[in-house]
Amino acid sequence: MRPKSWGWISMSERLEGKRVRIKAKGKIFEGIVMPSFTGNFVLKLDNGYNVGFKEYELLEVLEVEPFEPHLPELVKREGLPDVKIISTGGTIASKVDYRTGAVTSQFTAEEIASEVPELTEICNVDAELLYNILSENMKPENWIELARHVYKALKDHEGVIITHGTDTMHFSAAALSFMLSTPKPVVFVGAQRSSDRPSSDAAMNLLCAAKAATEDIGEVVVCMHGSTSDDYCLVHRGVKVRKNHTSRRDAFQSVNAKPIGRIDYPSLSVEWLSWRYRRGERELKLTDRLERKVVLIKFFPGLSSDILEYYHSKGYRGFVIEGTGLGHVSTDWIDTLRRVCEDSVVVMTSQCLWGRVCDRVYDTGRDILRAGVIEGEDMLPEVALIKLMWLLGNYSIEEAKEMVKKSVAGEIEPTTQY
């Protein structure tokens, strides 16, 4: 007998989180009832897809109570390295709450092992939920707190994994690259597709990140899908990586540098592709002050230099400019740049991203250099911004002007390959 609607609350609301069987167009469907605001059923099928049905198509409720998964008891395995996983948000090791439809963090070590049991074959997991925020809400204060937690974790773990939303993961990776000198791997990882979707990259990325966290690496890296298939992940230096696509699973790319390594899946075999800081090569050190009054300005045709005057009048000490081509702005900017450079640090980067800034080719570029602007070499604009925040937080203006030209964490390659 088909159930009837219960009072003013729709039947779909009453059955949220329950497993039901529905008949539609001569076929039988089973799944979990998801939230719906239309009065119809939205069913999460076992294959991960959501399908909508009318209430009258319901045949029966299969479970009265929501399914409660059994969480395995974790036993520390001798011979495996201890790895700390710090969550800041994102979709890695998260689950769908079938009552609300939201993806929620499930972040005890037992919950992670339940979702990605293969992790226990790679390392002993110790998990900590530091934040559960969207990555666009990350602020410099969060970077500092995160760096301090990682610094502490590195003292008694062989590596650290940081799960992070993908939109600003490259900002956070760059920030920790400058604030932390690390003798062990610090691996950022995220997911482009939420863990309830059949195309989710969450589990594979996490397994590859765990492998990276146990390898011969001594720096901050990002580990994400290397292609749109589930065949390998790439390990990118934290100061040379950028998210270059809104939704593709291989959105993260190394810019002006090769990836550090490739981790094949499911074998988890590692191939090193370029130079890297090795495990134990550097001493553990934390330098965590950041100057907030640094700004990134994207030049476009017709943009007035008044924007420089505005920030300068507000006490800003650092300016990163995304110029055109080789690193140019309008000649109208030259006089303002000269005044700003007297007591501030101004770094020129390129909107092109790939390639190297060179302001010695055209007259405008030479005028920019004579005004006191510093070429940003092959640094990404976001990396130059964070580097300048770090330098001005820990050094004088004159020291920062000299140090910004030098590679601190591998952010400047000695040559550019064409």
UniProtKB/Swiss-Prot annotation:
Enzyme Commission numbers on file: 6.3.5.-
Active site (record annotation): 91, 166-167, 243
SMART domains on file: Asparaginase (SM00870)
Record flagged with keyword Ligase: yes
Start and end residues of each Asparaginase/glutaminase domain: 81-407
The entry's keywords: ATP-binding, Ligase, Nucleotide-binding, Protein biosynthesis
Top enzyme class: ligase
GO biological processes: amino acid metabolic process; regulation of translational fidelity; translation
InterPro entries named among the record's database cross-references: AsnA_fam, Asp/glu_Ase-like_sf, Asparaginase/glutaminase-like, Asparaginase/glutaminase_AS1, Asparaginase/glutaminase_AS2, Asparaginase_C, GatD, GatD_N
Catalytic activities: L-glutamyl-tRNA(Gln) + L-glutamine + ATP + H2O = L-glutaminyl-tRNA(Gln) + L-glutamate + ADP + phosphate + H(+)
CDD domains in alphabetical order: GatD
Record's keyword annotation contains Disulfide bond: no
Gene Ontology MF: a single term: ATP binding
Matching NCBIfam families: asnASE_I (TIGR00519), gatD_arch (TIGR02153), PRK04183.1 (NF003217)
Family under the similarity heading: Belongs to the asparaginase 1 family. GatD subfamily.
Subunit structure, interactors included: Heterodimer of GatD and GatE.
UniProt function note: Allows the formation of correctly charged Gln-tRNA(Gln) through the transamidation of misacylated Glu-tRNA(Gln) in organisms which lack glutaminyl-tRNA synthetase. The reaction takes place in the presence of glutamine and ATP through an activated gamma-phospho-Glu-tRNA(Gln). The GatDE system is specific for glutamate and does not act on aspartate.
Record protein name field: Glutamyl-tRNA(Gln) amidotransferase subunit D
Lineage: Archaea, Methanobacteriati, Methanobacteriota, Archaeoglobi, Archaeoglobales
